[in-house]
Amino acid sequence: MKTLKYSWRFLMRSKSYTIINLLGLACSLACSIILMRYIHRELTVDTHCIDREHVYAICTNTEGNRGLSGLKQYNYDTISIDNRFVEAMTTYIPLEKDYVISGTNRIPARCLVTDSVFFQLFHYPIVQGKLSLTTPQSALLTEKYARKIFGNENPIGKILRYSNGKDITVEGIVGEPECKTTINFDIILSSKLSQHWERMNTELYRFLPGTDINAINKTGSVPRYINDPEYDTRTHTFSLISVKDIYWDGSLTDREPAMFLSGNRSHLIILSGVCLLLLLTGILNFINLYLVALLRRGKEYGLKKVFGVCGKTLFANIWIENTLLVLSALLVSWLIIEIMSAPTEYLFDTHFSYTAFDGWLSASILLLLPVITSIYPYIKYNYTSPILSIRSIGAQSHSKHFRMFFLGAQYIITFLLVVLSLYFNRQLGMLLSTKPGFRTKNIMNVNLVYESKDFSSYTYESMQQRRQRVMQLDNELNACPFIELYEPSYENILTPTFGTNYLNNKGEKVFLNIHYATPAFFKLYDIKVIEGEIPDINKEDRRTVFVVNKAALKALGYTSINGVGVIEENQKKANANASLQPIVAVVEDYFEGHLTSGIKPTIYPVGARFSGDLYQIAYTPGKKKEVIDFLRNLEYKLYGSEDFEYTFLEDDIKAMYTQDRQTATIYSIFASIAIIISSLGLLGISLFDIRQRYREIAIRKVNGASAKDLYRLLFRKYITVLIIAFVIAIPLAYYLINTYTQDFAVRAPVSIDIFIISLLLVIIISLGTLAYQIQKAAHINPTQIMKTE
């Protein structure tokens, strides 16, 4: 207790250093804790799964196109997993753009079709009702979706009309798991509701202990035919992928972005690096300022050692002081985190709730950080001769060198973060300003066709009615004066496409992406035809012609389309006599996704019309409101509801760069905080160093030194440290930038102005911190100083 009181009294006597140290460490801890919470949340995705490392999905690979699927839906050359090894098996079908009807309102819904076994593998909290799908009509709603439809009413037992025309009954309300989840939905439907859904299911397996997963994957690596090879020579392979790994493989789920979340390991590594650098900056700053404070007690420690104080007592004294500081900084950091919770959640696009991890993290910081920060001061004073401690307070050259070393290390990190911040903001600016190669203004992506996803619900009459509605829809769109062009499809221009192998006239195999289109597609997006001509194909014309982009033409080994053609490899395998189909036109390249992914060689099978619920609509500039009102009235006329989903292409493109924007913002914010922490460290050190040199300054003034000479003298040491730190940081920053962006098709140049701006920015802010103290020191009264020193 006596040691505790003594430590507290020392901290209170050194209020300036204590406050500066406390603020620097609190800022560092707050930023590091925020980042560690986010990183932990990313690393614990899907922990609501009973065993996410040993629950597996089937990942199929068909001619280079990977996706989650099942084995039971392949009817030719089939293979199945031996049920003797299976502990539990379930399936699910994601229906991203589905809907339900409540009263007269059509409400968009992300539906997940599954069975009760799903809840044996994934644990969801039950808010109301029961967590089961006992009947075909059973449905479970998320708490948020139930509130959206029913408000504060009790939803249990309520009836909703599903898109297939069947009624479903709300049996239960599920809450959100504490962890982040890959699959996100609004409604869970029973797989018994229909036998013929719009898309194939995905199978999930939990195997018995001892099952050889590698043996199953080896069996799955053997190519097998999808259909009878006489007509279809495509093959597929399969492998097992754990639930834990699905999140990190976005290519498996990128066609349903509203239902599936995916992670980016590179992004997480960046955040981990920023977290480590900020924490290191705070720790170095803490140790450095604490050493400065201890220099004032060098004589005291020397006398204590003369009178027999042992090393344990000295360490206990230093450790308690550091623990008090760390505890105070930790409390302040959590206060900062709480105050900044709303901006933080907006920045990271996730909700942070308090979990056991927060407690363990705080306890670890409180236990480990005081020990880490006490080691060097303890070694320094325990093994320093008492005579040296008594003779001098901070006059030893090695003390100054260590202070400058720690300060320099802080500034290396600061320069590194500032350079990275400037670069990634420039990279973001380039991504947002680079034209994708197609028209983006005044284009909407609109879901206009709201028909059943349940194929078993269709009869001849209902199919005819559907055709009539779609024909009426097209006629109304053609008659609208505000709509220039439209294109019905299942995806928009940004949606990831699949591909397959094509053969050129030499029989060489080339993988090309496939994008089905009509002649209107190229006009709608202002995609320039650079060779040949895309023919006008009317509705009665059932032919399909091939158009390629420049990248595909180059990949095929052609320089012109004159006399050349392509054929799908599978078609050639099925019919050796099949001839190449001519390429009628070449269009300009464009980026159909994130710019860093580059331009993909693409072939366009162009026909009269392709069906789809998604309409890509180009409208007259300045007529946005009129078009939306027109579409709302059209939906009401066709389906009896004014509700429909739409986005604008410009917004969709901006959304692609959300993570890039987040990275740039994080670097900017935390680089600014690193500057603040380093400036606080510089302030604390300069408070001591300049005060120690008052007698020297007084003597120099007596001998005729001008204020300009004193400014140069006092600034020189700190500028030297900053320049050395900058020189060391340049190659580190250059290496990190090049390593991270080496696979980017589009990246900003690493120009010298980034480094110059970072140098000027840090120097101006840092030396501005010193200005008042140096001005004060340069204008001291030599007589007064000589009397008191």
Regions found by a protein language model. Name each.
Residues 260-341, 345-346, 360:
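Hydrophobic alpha-helical bundles that form the membrane domains of multi-pass transporters
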Residues 35-98, 199-206, 217-221, 239-249, ...:
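Membrane-proximal extracellular/periplasmic loop immediately following the first transmembrane helix
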Residues 18, 27-56, 340-347, 413-442, ...:
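Alpha-helical transmembrane segments
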Residues 13-40, 262-299, 327, 402-427, ...:
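Hydrophobic alpha-helical transmembrane segments of multi-pass inner-membrane transport and secretion
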Residues 2-4, 9, 13-14, 223-275, ...:
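Membrane-helix entry/capping segments
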Residues 115-127, 139-263, 475-655:
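Mid-to-C-terminal secondary-structure elements
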